[in-house]
């Protein structure tokens, strides 16, 4: 006998991974230069030089046993001190090292936080469009996954739509800004309205409704747009952060959970996060990477290449007549599928070796996602294909 839920998760790849694997196969058949693969959000700019320098210096100067040995489960103190110092310098947030739990990227942090906040019969909501893996994360934690219908075409948060689905069994809502897949950044007004609503409903229900703020794209914002730090707007916010995108380290798996003192029962929540991580098999985040973050927590990415790609694609597609949500952050565009059927449009594009992820798994069936963390040359070469598809 096996676990049927686990079997289904393992045997059915996500639409993103399936398209990515197809792209790799097609690249072998027709040449990588002839495949326009916009499927996967894999950073295309190198890690900052400070990161590579830190790795080299650590390998040369640090005793091997110390460098590769176990750390504490919550993470090395120097790493947590560096993260707290960086957050306080930027946001005056009052972060303490003991409020931080170092994780193997954002995904296990999200799962641990969901588990920590789940009570019998609990529901955790996400705003469409949302990252598809939220559903298995929430369900693995033992909660029910609920979706708040998308606010199209702005893709902000519609207060009335959320209020209609807020019930006493809602433990938390997941907020992802800058957003994957839309590239939209939630405005300060949007987040203030959200905080006001959750405060009022929490008082009505007799328990706080937490926000789980998923922030892997926090540093990826353009045109000077503000990315508000949610714990300063809503006290019951838990932050899940990853350095995968900001430092181009997706394969190294390093991030953190921040449980602010302002959150209800913060000490218990922190302990519950630690316990949930333990039950998931967490021992510690990679020791070498923790030491890198201790030196590089304040390093920022060079966004010039992403911004150039963003402008080229957004302006090019909009000029052709595509309806596109203006991308202010991350490295995604979310485009309305001509004809309204994203699956059919993506299949048609696939026949031209243009790989676009339909929005069905993101909770928005009529849209498709473009990841523009690719070469600028590929973008320029693919634009005529987008024009052909629109004309057909």
Give names to the regions the model predicted.
Residues 1-19, 27-59, 74, 78, ...:
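PLP-dependent class I/II
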Residues 62:
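Conserved AdoMet
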Residues 66-67:
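Pre-Walker A segment
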């Amino acid at each position: 006998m096996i676990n049927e839920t686990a079997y289904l998760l393992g045997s059915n790849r996500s639409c993103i991974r399936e398209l990515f694997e197809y792209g790799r196969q097609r690249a072998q058949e027709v040449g990588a230069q002839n495949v326009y693969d916009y499927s996967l959000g894999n950073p295309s700019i190198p890690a900052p030089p400070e990161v590579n320098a830190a790795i080299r210096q650590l390998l040369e100067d640090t005793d091997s046993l110390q460098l590769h040995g176990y750390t504490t489960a919550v993470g090395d103190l120097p790493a947590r001190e560096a993260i707290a110092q960086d957050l306080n310098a930027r946001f005056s947030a009052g972060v303490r090292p003991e409020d931080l739990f170092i994780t193997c990227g954002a995904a296990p942090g999200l799962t641990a936080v969901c588990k920590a906040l789940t009570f019998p019969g609990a529901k955790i909501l996400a705003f469409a469009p949302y990252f598809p893996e939220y559903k298995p994360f929430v369900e693995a934690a033992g909660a029910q996954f609920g979706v708040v219908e998308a606010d199209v075409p702005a893709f902000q948060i519609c207060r009335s739509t959320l209020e209609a689905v807020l019930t006493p069994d809602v433990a938390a809502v997941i907020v992802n800004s800058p957003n994957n897949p839309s590239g939209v950044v939630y405005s300060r007004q949007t987040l203030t309205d959200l905080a006001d609503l959750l405060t009022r409903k929490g008082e009505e229900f007799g328990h706080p409704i937490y926000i789980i703020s998923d922030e892997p794209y926090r540093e990826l914002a353009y045109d000077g747009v503000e990315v508000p730090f949610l714990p300063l707007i809503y006290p019951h916010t838990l932050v899940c952060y990853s350095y995968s995108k900001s430092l181009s380290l997706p394969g190294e798996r390093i991030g953190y959970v921040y449980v602010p003192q302002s959150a209800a029962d913060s000490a218990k929540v922190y302990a519950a996060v630690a316990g949930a991580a333990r039950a998931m098999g967490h021992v510690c985040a990679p020791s070498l990477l923790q030491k890198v973050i201790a030196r590089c927590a304040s390093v920022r990415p060079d966004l010039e290449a992403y911004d150039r790609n963003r402008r080229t694609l957004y302006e090019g597609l909009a000029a052709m007549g595509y309806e596109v949500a203006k991308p202010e952050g991350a490295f995604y565009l979310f485009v309305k599928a001509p004809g309204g059927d994203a699956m059919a449009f993506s299949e048609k594009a696939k026949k031209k070796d243009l790989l676009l992820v339909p929005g069905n798994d993101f909770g928005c069936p009529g849209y498709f996602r473009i990841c523009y963390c690719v070469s600028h040359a590929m973008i320029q070469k693919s634009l005529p294909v987008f024009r052909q598809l629109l004309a057909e």
